[in-house]
């Protein structure tokens, strides 16, 4: 019985799951929005939110903890240089999940997961000149 076992298995072994969420966390930190399946997005929240909370206080120990969890130097740099200061006044809830329909091949529910205070992307073109 799997009573009181938290987290989703996602039909993967533990090392595959750990590597997948490590890669997805790095992608989310670098791009600030990614598209994935809904269960993966919900589980990714549990990985990324503590990393951003860790980045709010910049110290060598916290940087080493973040590197141990992501294994990516660029991700750690962006976490502590950009995201930590950006979310300094926010007490949790750094991500948002937006459902976006179903995948064509297998009808899996898809979702965007994004950082909430993401800078607005300019949609203006060069035709305004």
Swiss-Prot record:
Gene3D superfamilies associated with the record: Ribosomal protein L17 (3.90.1030.10)
Domain of life where this protein originates: Bacteria
Gene Ontology cellular component terms for the protein in this record: cytosolic large ribosomal subunit
HAMAP family: Ribosomal_bL17
UniProt similarity note: Belongs to the bacterial ribosomal protein bL17 family.
Name listed for the protein in its UniProt record: Large ribosomal subunit protein bL17
Record's subunit section: Part of the 50S ribosomal subunit. Contacts protein L32.
Key words of the record: Ribonucleoprotein, Ribosomal protein
GO BP of this protein: translation
GO molecular function: structural constituent of ribosome
PANTHER family the UniProt entry points to: LARGE RIBOSOMAL SUBUNIT PROTEIN BL17M (PTHR14413:SF16), RIBOSOMAL PROTEIN L17 (PTHR14413)
Keyword Calcium: no
Keyword Ribosomal protein in record: yes
């Amino acid at each position: 019985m799997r009573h009181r076992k938290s987290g989703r298995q996602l039909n993967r072994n533990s090392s595959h799951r750990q590597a997948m969420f490590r890669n997805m966390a790095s992608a989310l930190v670098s791009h600030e929005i990614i598209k994935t399946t809904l269960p993966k997005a919900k589980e990714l929240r549990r990985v990324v939110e503590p990393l951003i909370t860790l980045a709010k206080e910049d110290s060598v120990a916290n940087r080493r903890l973040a590197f141990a969890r992501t294994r990516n130097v660029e991700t750690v740099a962006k976490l502590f240089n950009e995201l930590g200061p950006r979310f300094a006044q926010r007490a949790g809830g750094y991500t948002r999940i937006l459902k976006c329909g179903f995948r064509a091949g297998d009808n899996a529910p898809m979702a965007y997961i994004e950082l909430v205070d993401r800078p607005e992307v300019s949609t203006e073109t060069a035709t305004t000149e």
